[in-house]
Amino acid sequence: MRFGIPLGLVRPDAWHDLAVAADELGFDSVWLPEHLVLATGGGMQGYPGGRAPIRPSTPLYDAPVRLAALAAATRRVRLGTAVYLLGLRHPLISARAFATLDEIAGGRTVLGAGAGWYRAEWDAVGAPFAERGGRLDEAIGVLRRLWSEEAVAHGGPHFPFPEVAFEPKPPRRAVPILIGGESPAALSRAARNDGWISMPAPPERVAGAAAELRRLRAEAGREGEPFEVVAHAEGGCRPDETAAWTAAGVHTLIVRPWRRGRDALAAAERFARDHGLAPGAPSDRARPARPAS
């Protein structure tokens, strides 16, 4: 089992030290959430699965920029978004942001994407909330082409553009795209891409979704292709609980083994010790060779 750390659940001024510790302790990944804006009206709602409304004063950051800073401070740990709202932005902008991040990170980026649930963001940028799924699908297709083809023109309904060149490509000429969410549409979208990210949930609920993903991928003839299931635990994970997550089909478990954010660093150290984590060599995810330009 690989373990990840949700940086968004501690204060931003702790992200650097916690990410560096995760890198040194043997965690697999660190993850940042993403929102563009928060409404100030009385209709503010909480994160699905959460218990309290999100405060409008909550600080928000550009996730690829913050992850790039963490990439420069780490050597091995993967850097992911959970999740990034691709459909809110033109894919040329997102493609550039994540290609730049992945260049700095040496191929350690994971793009977790979602259609979104918070309508106020869409209203703020003038994008139709009802079209968020189609915009996400179209954006994903554009990103994959920009990262792999020499020149790209796109005629889709949401983001048409004339032929352009896009350089540099990401080190792998791709960035893994995982889809977050538990709706039928989200699972179907995840099955067409590189992986799935759960909401905070117990292993038995994740197991049901993972089984459905296996069915969807088998129907599409993709069961032999790489696919990552990332689950959010509802808190930590004791060593004797790991087997249940493995049986549920989880490859990477995002854990929060602390009750208070100020205890996160010490809790991560205890977690790594209890689970026998050990850092892998930085070359495990070294930058692949690229032809000279």
Where does each model-flagged region fall?
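Active-site-adjacent structural elements that line small-molecule/cofactor binding pockets in enzymes
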Residues: 1-293
